């Protein structure tokens, strides 16, 4: 069973759960929007059984972690520093980093800016910043990204999250999210200040000059990387997973044609096998057929 902890890193108090061999290789799993640590509940035990020390934080602003005020507290650079500081505070110089959605955006940033703390990188349905800039010009992606523009409004997105957030949690697998899952998610969203903090990620992204410079410069990733992409993502075009070897030389891409954005929920067994194989160094193919 996971144990729950609180730790202060980079000036913010983070809640995290931990399970597995304390002496094993550290694997840090980063959730996305609008989730929290339980996003990875079907991956935690399989990774622990494979010998990893598994640590899963609530990102700043989420669930039981601290919720600093102001949009600037949620810039990608700050989020990336949180994770780097967490890895160091856990007594490790490096860790495997796995990120989905916003957790993937943070994981990309960490691998780009602080590769010395990343051993292996796994990204699930989160765009590399340079590829995102290319695809963002396409009207088809604009239509899918409507919520990013909506989230720039004051107070209204928070109301939307409280009333309709659970609507988004539907994968292609009917068992992706249970009624109990949705109850726990609503409980996390109802933590004081959580809704505004979560939506501030999007507000900060739109205002981040550094993120725009980085996406324009084609930031390189120099660590072994696995990208797992659910092809039935309604928010992100499948082509966001194309052409990544331009920026990521040591790359493997696995496309799951039946999975949605919630890929680790739709196909947990497949994802778990890929994670264990890749993080153990056993997945060597340049691209794994679907």
Question: Residue locations for each model-derived region?
Answer:
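Catalytic histidine-centered segment of alpha/beta-hydrolase-like enzymes
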Residues: 259-268, 272
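Conserved HGGG/HGGXW glycine-rich cap/lid loop of the alpha/beta-hydrolase fold
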Residues: 18-66
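Alpha/beta-hydrolase-fold serine-hydrolase catalytic core, especially in secreted/extracellular enzymes
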Residues: 282-290
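A short, glycine- and basic residue-enriched loop/turn
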Residues: 36-37, 105, 259-260
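Short phosphate-engaging motifs
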Residues: 36, 194, 271
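Flexible "cap/lid" subdomain of the alpha/beta-hydrolase fold that forms the substrate-access gate
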Residues: 2-5, 12-14, 19, 26, ...
